[in-house]
Amino acid sequence: YILLDCPAGIEQGFMNAIAGADRAIIVTTPEVSAIRDADRIIGLLNSNQLKKMELIINRIRMDMVKRGDMMTVDDVTEILSIPLIGALPDDEQVVIGTNQGEPVIGLDSKAGMAYMNICKRIMGMDVPFMELQGSTGFFSKLSGLFKKD
């Protein structure tokens, strides 16, 4: 595997790097500017005939999703229209583990479990997605249509 962390400004180096790629995993956060950048990357990959693209959504904060201040996983996947292989909650245990030099995968945390599941999906295993949506799922949205202000 070759991993590229690409800035928003796509240059010739990016185009050279993807020339031999047969698969791309786009990692984004659920913020409007990041989604725009990811969409631009997807467009460039499509125009270069790279068809196998997958999505990881990073740093999801459920408190913000519940307040309506952050896009949901479903919102992001609907906008970008590529298969999701993982969603990572914004987990303070990641910061603590990183500061202590502990591997995130080994942490007993939601993020650690999400990372492990993503690794398994990359390797072709079929593993279920963790529930991150909380009360913002389908039935919650449906019931929200009937609430009076």
Predicted regions and their residues:
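Generic recognition of short, well-ordered alpha-helical interface segments
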Residues: 33, 71, 110-113, 117
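Secondary-structure junction/capping motif
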Residues: 71-72, 103-104, 137
